[in-house]
Amino acid sequence: MKASMFLALAGLVLLFVVGYASESEEKDFPRELLSKIFAVDDFKGEERGCKGFGDSCTPGKNECCPNYACSSKHKWCKVYLGK
């Protein structure tokens, strides 16, 4: 029962979005909306110069971001609490 209510609500929301997009004066709006909804890989394209929490690293090299240190035991970046 809960699943069918959720699907009905999701269908109504999708119908509202499609109806609003079709009435919009901007022709690129539906394409832009769909690209923003399904833009999952955009964050993967950005690379950092350092490694964050849980990333694998080599002890002795300064690969981890500030406030992180490479664990010699586990070989991944974790929070550096000081000495």
UniProtKB/Swiss-Prot annotation:
Main localization of the protein described in the UniProt heading: secreted
Tissue: Expressed by the venom gland.
Record has Disulfide bond as a keyword: yes
Keyword field contains Secreted: yes
Signal sequence coordinates: 1-21
Disulfide bonds: C50-C65, C57-C70, C64-C77
Additional remark text: Negative results: has no activity on Nav1.4, Nav1.5, Nav1.8 and Nav1.9 sodium and calcium currents.
Protein name per its UniProtKB record: Hainantoxin-III 11
Lineage: Eukaryota, Metazoa, Ecdysozoa, Arthropoda, Chelicerata
